Each structure stands twice: as C-alpha cells, then as structure tokens.
UniProtKB/Swiss-Prot annotation:
Receptor for ATP and UTP coupled to G-proteins that activate a phosphatidylinositol-calcium second messenger system. It comes from the Eukaryota. InterPro entries: GPCR_Rhodpsn (IPR000276), GPCR_Rhodpsn_7TM (IPR017452), P2Y2_rcpt (IPR000356). This is P2Y purinoceptor 2. It comes from Cricetulus griseus (Chinese hamster). Keywords: Cell membrane, G-protein coupled receptor, Membrane, Receptor, Transducer, Transmembrane, Transmembrane helix. PROSITE patterns: G_PROTEIN_RECEP_F1_2 (PS50262). The chain crosses the membrane at residues 25-45, 73-93, 116-136, 160-166. It is a multi-pass membrane protein. The keyword Membrane applies. GO terms for biological process: blood vessel diameter maintenance; phospholipase C-activating G protein-coupled receptor signaling pathway; positive regulation of mucus secretion. The lineage of its organism: Eukaryota, Metazoa, Chordata, Craniata, Vertebrata. Pfam families: 7tm_1 (PF00001). Its main location: membrane.
Length: 166
C-alpha cells in the first residue's frame, strides 16, 4: 500500500513513510494474525481409540464443521482481503506507470518498463505461491464435508499437501 501511494500520490505518501508508523502497523498486523490463528490451538487435537492416539490434521470429527467455518473466515481475512488489496494496488501502479507523461512522445522509458515487469512478476509469484494452496485447501475441506469416494478425497488431499509448501 505504501508503494502504491508512493506511485499514485507521492506527496501524500511522505507522511506515511516514517519508521515509527511502520513499526506500529507491523505490530498491529502481528497481533491480528496471532489472534486470528489462536483458535487453531483449540481445533487441532488428538483423540484416543484404545491404545492408539490420532493427531488430527485439522480437527476432530465432531469439531470439523466449526473448523470449516473458521477456515472460511480466515480465508477471507488472511488471504482474500490482502490478495485483493495487493492486486488492486499493483494494477493501479502499473496503469499509472504505463500512462505517458504529459507532453512526452515516444515509447515508455526503460525504468518504467522495468517497474511494470517487476509488478507483473510480483503478482505472478504471489499468485503462484498462495492461490493453489488456498484453492486446494478450500476444496479439501468442502469435499470432506460431503459424502465423496475415498479416491476423490485422497486425490484432493494429495493436491492440498503438495501445495502446502508453496
């Protein structure tokens, strides 16, 4: 957002660039993320059947519907909202950089072309790294709620586990 303001409104962005402000924003973000992730400690549990202890990847069966609701809210707050903000900011920056300067003729200056390429690369990497995981996780949780075959569940579970490290 700061970078976007720097491109779209350079003079206004000067007051947002102070280190004290950046530290406050970072602290608030960390507190929010920790608060949003704290319920995982409640949902991720173990269960005992006889002498066998099972560590649940998501939650115990009886809590799973609540876990899916929690995960959906977290998907919105911690992925969809930031992804949308990043997408909008970078698209606005690219549009501004591609716009010819007043009174100039000819092609786009090399520095602006390089900036637009960097914007495209950042968006591509962010999308490639985060979108597959969130899509497969959402599908996996949704499919687990339905009565689907083990083959289908195993296939989506494999895709989910493959995209986790991204």
């Amino acid at each position: 957002v700061h970078r976007c303001l720097g491109v779209l409104r350079p003079l206004h962005s000067l007051r947002w660039g102070r280190a004290r402000y950046a530290r406050r924003v970072a602290a608030v973000v960390w507190v929010l993320v920790l608060a949003c992730q704290a319920p995982v400690l409640y949902f991720v549990t173990t269960s005992v059947r006889g002498t066998r202890i099972t560590c649940h990847d998501t939650s115990a069966r009886e809590l799973f519907s609540h876990f899916v609701a929690y995960s959906s809210v977290m998907l919105s707050l911690l992925f969809a909202v930031p992804f949308s903000v990043i997408l909008v900011c970078y698209v606005l920056m690219a549009r501004r950089l591609l716009k010819p300067a007043y009174g100039t003729t000819g092609g786009l200056p090399r520095a602006k072309r390089k900036s637009v390429r960097t914007i495209a690369l950042v968006l591509a990497v962010f999308t490639l790294c985060f979108l597959p995981f969130h899509v497969t996780r959402t599908l996996y949780y949704s499919f687990r709620s339905l009565d689907l075959s083990c083959h289908t569940l195993n296939a989506i579970n494999m895709a989910y586990k493959i995209t986790r490290p991204l």
